[in-house]
Curated annotation (Swiss-Prot):
Pfam families referenced in this protein's UniProt entry, alphabetically: Ribosomal_L23 (PF00276)
The protein, known as: Large ribosomal subunit protein uL23
Entry's Gene Ontology molecular function annotations: rRNA binding; structural constituent of ribosome
Gene: rplW
Record function comment: One of the early assembly proteins it binds 23S rRNA. One of the proteins that surrounds the polypeptide exit tunnel on the outside of the ribosome. Forms the main docking site for trigger factor binding to the ribosome.
Length: 95
């Protein structure tokens, strides 16, 4: 797999912002087929940051309604990447 295709987007919520500031952890939405080793290599190559640990979870899609029709969002995989002390990944700083 190409490393740029593994990482889909950063997950930006109140919780992930707090984790980034306090625990030096960054959260990404990643390809569902990716494993921890591939995610670690992708982050290290794409962002030039050393990774200490990777935790993953499959998030179930929510059920949604459009009038009478009931649908479901797709399931997705979340990766919480813990960076080594002194490392940083900046997404929106300076904007």
């Amino acid at each position: 797999m190409v490393y740029h295709d593994l990482i889909r987007r950063p997950v930006t919520t109140e919780k992930t912002t707090l984790q980034k500031e306090t625990a030096n952890q960054v959260t990404f939405e990643v390809d569902r087929r990716a494993n921890r080793v591939e995610i670690k290599r992708a982050v290290e190559q794409v962002f030039n940051a050393k990774v200490a640990a990777v935790n993953t979870a499959t998030v179930k899609g929510k059920k949604k309604r459009m009038g009478r029709n009931i649908g479901k969002r797709k399931d997705w995989k979340k990766a919480v990447v813990t960076l080594m002390p002194g490392e940083r990944i900046d997404f929106f700083e300076g904007v």
